[in-house]
Amino acid sequence: MSLANFFNEIAFKWQKEWENSKVYEANPETDKPKKFITVAFPYTNSPLHIGHGRTYITADIYARYLRMKGYNVLFPFAFQFTGTPILSISESVKRGDEEIISTFVNIYQIPKEEIEKFSDPTYLAEYFKNNMKNTAKKLGLGIDWRREFTTVDPIFEKFVQWQYRKLMELGYIKREDSPVAYCPRDEFPVGMHDTKGDVEPEITDLDGIYFPSGDYFFIAATPRPETIFGAVALLVNPEADYVIATDSLNRKVIISRQAYDKLKYQISFREEGEKKGKDLVGMIAKNPVTEKEIKVLPSKFVDPSIGTGVVMAVPSHEPLHYIALTELKEEFELIPVIKTDELGELPGVEAVGLAQTRNPAELKDYIDTIYRIEYHKGIMREDLVDLVPNFMKEFVKDKIAGKLVKDAREKTRELLDMLNSRITIYEISNGPVYCRCGAEIVVKVIKGQWFIDYSNPIWKTSVLKSLDKINFIPTDSKKEMEKIIFNLQPRAFTRSRGLGVRLPWDEKEIIDSLSDSTIYTAFYTIVHKLKYPISLLSDKFWDYILLDRGTADEISKELGIPKEQLEEIKSEFKYWYPVDSRHSGRDLIQNHLPYYLFHHFAIFGEKFLPRQIVTNGFIRVGGKKMSKSFGNIYPLNRAIDEYGVETVRIALTSTSSISDDIEFNSNIAKSIAEQLKKIHDLISKLLEIEGVNERRDPDVWLLSIFRRYIEDVDKAYENLDLRTVYMTVYYTIYETIKDYIELTNAKINKDIIKKVISIWLRLMAPITPHLAEELWHKMSNTFVVKEKFPSINEVEYNEKSLLKVEYLRSIIEDVNRLSSELGKEAEKVVIYVNDDNNLRELLKKAIIAIKDRKSLRDFMIENNVDDKTARRIYELANVLPSTIRDLIVTTDIDEEEVIVQNINFLMNKLDLREMIVYSSTDEKAPNILGKKDLALPYKPGIAIL
């Protein structure tokens, strides 16, 4: 039987037992403290992959740990049906999208007859909901499944609609014409979760300036309209296609084909014809501000997909423009517009040298520097007044000339608006970004779009202040959250079609998936009790249950719901809320988590904000983040089948710190599985040994060191330092038990080994609950997952016994290190121990001095000791293993006696033929390789022969 099958057989057996015994169904217990753990629920548009697994297993481990610590733990789960991801996949299947269908067939192993049914988005969502639930169960997640729901359940819709009426009352909802990222194929606004690669489309604005040219107008796009005074040419790409279109004022405008295909979603254009870029070259246009005639010139550096595909050339301040015009060998004028102390009069000209070096990065840095300095420190030149016609001179003199660039920019826009020569153009600044359907995202100006006003200063400030009351794991995620919240702007939150909750006051609009998933964690606390007709769940019902408004008598009388049931529902909400630990991937810091906090603060105030937010890194496969484009999506079901549940639980959570990405590969998984099998076999074997009753130093040492393990692992679980838990529980303890067996010559103390195994299994139960349960039942009939977490009070602590064995282990480590440095295997070892009591006392004082942060000089003066001795002892105190250093301050051992009594153990561990022990103070002892002179207390001199 493969290791995967071996562990899965164990896992599935205990999962059934736990489910039958309702182990994870949590109900209020007023005499017991609670912990409410939640994870960001998944989109049901494909099966769960190992990236999901990291977040869900981490939360499950934490929930299991807290349950064992005596808390009443609720860990629920639900499914996101809302919005465009599901609809996009469904429509892709309907179109016969080969990439999507191939992914379902080849990666997720879904039968083709099922895939054909995915053209119905509801069927698709239900299919993957059931698939995800089965996977979550296979993972061993301790979910209270009574509380599951989907975001299209009618009862959930009532809950969300109540929330949005509250937000409207509070003034956080507004409606306006505004640019949004938009999929032209699916015809709805999109966000991060709607795009390939989960890229958040970022919108920036440009100024489109009209340059008249006979019967036409070229529209040139620029981020720096104030430089128009220095525009001396228009540049077009001679190889590109250009469109002649009529605007709302019946002006015939010229822009690139690619620009037209994007801008038609923002501006009222009507296509009239088409021209090649090369046919536009030679036309004469007019600068609308200076009224100077300027040429239309060819330049392949013009990207027809950016802006309008027409560039106004300002060579005096734009290095690329200067380079382009220079390459044409055309005569052109250089008109300085902005002056600064840092840059020359014509900074664009200075780029020639950089261009000749052919160093694009250096040139880009120079251009960015020009933009930054001119915007923040630049002043518009006074002589700009001389460049404009008389009717503009007064405006330019009063509003633009001599003014700071950042102020003049707005005034230049005002001037262009008065001339009816400017429009605002929106671009995807981090484009191209693609919808999941494959279409490139554009910007569309939507009339009457509904927004949540995350820019509201009072709301935003309140949320920022509240972050101090939340514990963040990892801690640096708080700073990232602060930055995101500070920069949040109003966000479009409705779609015109798709699955989801209807906007209560505009039912043709659907609330999007990031906006109906903000306070849904409150819904978990009561959903299993809401068995009433939808019509009864009015706003007054939610106000009473969630906001404690009104009385049970009033609500009962109005809705016909028994008073006792209302009070019970409200009591359950108040018992569980707020969330004690909110878990997600770190990508959700960009959107979901800030929205989660904003909405909680708006609806509930500060008291119901989550007490902790945990964000984990990603899973990488083949050294890359999982992506369909890389072909490295790894379904969770496949991982479980290939490696086993317990292996997957460790591999996805515990081989790295929580903030770091984890590499998932076959070698790592197989290594974990093999170690788990070793642990299984070792414990099984130990429980069969009859053992002895005699208590010896190794027995007491084992109990004492387990006290330390309990402390370390407890702290690590609390801080979600799962790597420390993993290394301690699955490797360090395993090696410790093996050392114990060797120290006792396999004559184990039966009572002590059972006690230690009991502790070991409970330490591993949060991460590998199935393995722990299987082995626990060789000792007990109770469920280990319901047992108490180990306490240090369960084991006795003897410093002397602990020091003896830790001293032996340090010798083993030193011999191995020396062998490695010498490049040879040790066969014979000579050990010199230093039993000078004066030096031993001095070492204790050195350890205390270092703890008190005293310098070497202070230590020497206080103890009246010579420089050489003080330095050696002080340095030793610094490098001794902490396991020894902390003990020798309060206890002591006879080093030579300890080595002699355990010489067989040392020789077996080191695979030695011979070991000899001398006292370094024995004058008759030989000084082999000078090691006798090097011996210090607890740091013997070691000669390898």
Swiss-Prot record:
Catalysed reaction equations from the record: tRNA(Leu) + L-leucine + ATP = L-leucyl-tRNA(Leu) + AMP + diphosphate
Position of sequence motif 'HIGH' region: 42-52
GO cellular component assignments: cytoplasm
GO biological process, any: leucyl-tRNA aminoacylation
Residues bound to ATP: 628
Family under the similarity heading: Belongs to the class-I aminoacyl-tRNA synthetase family.
Protein name per the record: Leucine--tRNA ligase 1
Gene: leuS1
